[in-house]
Design a protein with these regions (language model features):
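Hydrophobic alpha-helical membrane-insertion segments
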Residues: 100-119, 282-291, 351-359
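Transmembrane-helix bundle segments that line or gate the permeation/cavity pathway
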Residues: 3, 53-56, 63-187, 207
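Hydrophobic cores of alpha-helical transmembrane segments in multi-pass inner/ER membrane proteins
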Residues: 70-77, 106-111, 164-176, 241-256, ...
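TerminUS-proximal long segments
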Residues: 3-7, 139-147, 328-333, 339-431
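Non-cytosolic membrane-interface motifs at loop->transmembrane helix junctions
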Residues: 56-62, 91-93, 228-240, 311, ...
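Juxtamembrane/interface segments at transmembrane-helix termini
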Residues: 47-55, 60, 79-92, 119-121, ...
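N-terminal regions that are enriched for targeting/export leaders
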Residues: 2-70, 155, 422-431
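Long, contiguous internal "core" modules enriched in hydrophobic/ aromatic residues
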Residues: 22-45, 132-136, 150-325, 342, ...
């Protein structure tokens, strides 16, 4: 018969040293080495391919993946401040480190912004005269001309820079404000905790709305506008959910890895790990729901303005990729996270989360590459296509090194928090 037993004594407490373990420096060095190696591989592939086109396309993938962690980490931090919960005590410092890694994402974005004509069809045409000439020689079709002419007040270089920089400024402001106040909260008296809880709620509540709007604007310009004919009312929401999907995966990996030493060895209990696994499962479900709902509505509607976007990603061997995307991105994580044992097992949950990050990158490949004329409905091998491995791995590696620097800069646990005492209580398990 099952019985309750304590897994720890009542005298547990936080260790005196709350700084990140020394092995985080090892993570940083390994990430830098991997980044350099894959940068060299990317350069070699570009030489073999004879073009930088795939380098820049893969660069967008790497930028969107790291952007999702930085801005998505900021968003999840704000959600935690509004909702509360013990899980926030585990992820708060890693989420802050993600948000404070945003400067590197800005550097990545600048590379994209300086190469608009190579990545965005609309950037090649500044007026109706230009699109008319391109239509006559067969470079674009009627739908592309109509959409670019109609959307020109929005899809132009000046607006791309202006909207993007305003979004970055807002994200930087929120990241700085929330992370700096976090340090002030730790330095304050526990008696003022209710004041700090209210203050963070007042900042984070409106911040979530601002995040949703600015993130949607950013992904419309950075990814959606690669095909100027495409429009979707849930595109921003798909990326919002996708960011939650990948941020939780990375956050769990970091938390479990940190639990090999103090202070996370003390505070990461099976209960909170299980809770994080359930949250991740929820994002997996929401992710496939939105993606499939959009596909079903557009496919059944079969409108000539909408259906080509999916045909570009299904025909010409792309059907293999979309099938694998469904399996990688949803079916495998869904099936594995159904298991309670996997969610409570550190090694297995880490493997699932690592797979989810790979699946997210694979999904971004399916979203980005078919936007280009040489790839739409024509999946084929070239040296350039391998850039989708080399370039993102290098960019993610450098981002991880930057993230580790940010993580080392502050104590890993926010001590002035009412959940500290709760998370240090003995954990009850069923024997």
């Amino acid at each position: 018969m099952a019985k309750d037993s304590h897994t720890a004594t009542h005298d547990r407490g936080l260790p005196a040293d709350l700084s990140a373990p020394a092995f985080v420096d090892g993570w940083k060095m390994r990430a830098l080495v991997v980044g350099v190696i894959f940068s060299l591989i990317a350069a070699g592939l570009a030489f073999a391919d004879g073009s930088l086109d795939h380098v820049l396309r893969a660069w967008v993938l790497g930028m969107m993946l790291t952007f999702g962690w930085s801005v998505g980490g900021l968003a999840l931090l704000m959600v935690q401040y509004c909702s509360g919960g013990k899980w926030g005590l585990l992820l708060r410092r890693p989420l802050e480190a993600m948000a404070r890694s945003l400067p590197l994402v800005l550097v990545y974005w600048i590379v994209v912004a300086l190469n608009l004509k190579r990545l965005y069809l609309w950037a090649q045409f500044k007026s109706d005269i230009d699109t008319t000439a391109a239509l006559k020689v067969g470079f674009i079709n009627e739908l592309q001309k109509h959409c670019m002419d109609f959307k020109r007040p929005m899809l132009n270089t000046s607006m791309f820079w202006a909207v993007s920089l305003v979004c970055f400024a807002i994200w930087f402001l929120y990241a700085y404000r929330l992370t700096s106040l976090g340090l002030k909260r730790d330095a304050d008296s526990p008696a003022n905790t209710p004041y700090w809880i209210k203050k963070f709620e007042n900042i984070a509540g409106p911040g979530i709305v601002v995040y949703a709007l600015t993130m949607t604007a950013a992904v419309i310009y950075w990814v959606m506008s690669m095909d100027p004919t495409w429009f979707s009312s849930v595109y921003g929401l798909l990326f919002l959910v996708g960011q939650g999907y990948s941020v939780l995966a990375l956050g769990i990996i970091v938390a479990i890895a940190l639990s090999k030493a103090e202070p996370f060895k003390t505070i990461l209990r099976q209960t909170e790990q299980h809770d994080l696994g359930k949250m991740t499962f929820a994002f997996v479900m929401l992710n496939i729901y939105l993606g499939f709902a959009q596909f079903l509505i557009i496919w059944s509607g079969n409108l000539p303005e909408e259906i080509p976007w999916y045909l570009d990603r299904i025909r010409g061997h792309w059907g293999i990729i979309i099938t694998l995307d469904f399996i990688f991105h949803w079916l495998i994580p869904f099936s594995l996270l159904l298991s309670r044992d996997i969610k409570r097992n550190k090694k297995r949950l880490t493997l699932v989360c690592q797979w989810m990050i790979f699946a997210k990158a694979f999904d971004l490949f399916w979203l980005i590459e078919p936007n280009f004329k040489d790839a739409a409905r024509n999946l084929h091998f070239s040296w350039g296509i391998l850039e989708y491995v080399a370039v993102p791995v290098a960019m993610v590696s450098f981002w991880i090194a930057f993230f580790c620097t940010r993580l080392k800069a502050r104590p890993l646990v926010q001590t002035n928090d009412p959940h500290v005492a709760e998370i240090l209580e003995p954990e009850h398990v069923h024997a």
